Amino acid sequence: MFPLHLVLIPIIPLLLLVSHNVDIVSLQDVFLPFLILVSVAIFFQATISRFFKSKAKVALVISWFYILFFSYGHIHGYLNQIMGSSILELAVQNRYLVPIFGILFLLGSFCVLKIKKILDVLTKFVNVWAVVMVSILLFNIVSYVISGFLQQEKILGLEIEPKDIEISKSLPDIYY
């Protein structure tokens, strides 16, 4: 099975940002980051695949890295929010959280690479998850764009023509 998640998972955060800021961001602004994210994922796949036999396992490791990488800031912010006092904030400093994420990455990578079975089921699951996430985000973006076009069309359809304006011959008495 083709690891479609290798291309889709890196663009999920980009699409998420676009879907929350669709009124501000143009498609030209999204193209370059999209190209960079996808080409870096493909570069990692091509480079790391030289050292391992299974390209599907390497794709899962790269996807695992992207998931951890893009979720780090959210988890860090959430933990800071939970532990509000200055004493407890020591638990969520980067020097403590980065090693935890590093260990999570190494454990996940080790498990994926050392499993003797072919990971078709896991690849299918991650592919379906990535397709669903991208589909939801694209649906949000497209529905907003379409609703914007419909609102523009409605506004343009209600324009007042100069011939529709009635000009009164008698001026109002503003001085009483």
Q: Residue locations for each model-derived region?
A:
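Soluble catalytic regions of membrane-associated enzymes that act on cell-envelope
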Residues: E153-Y176
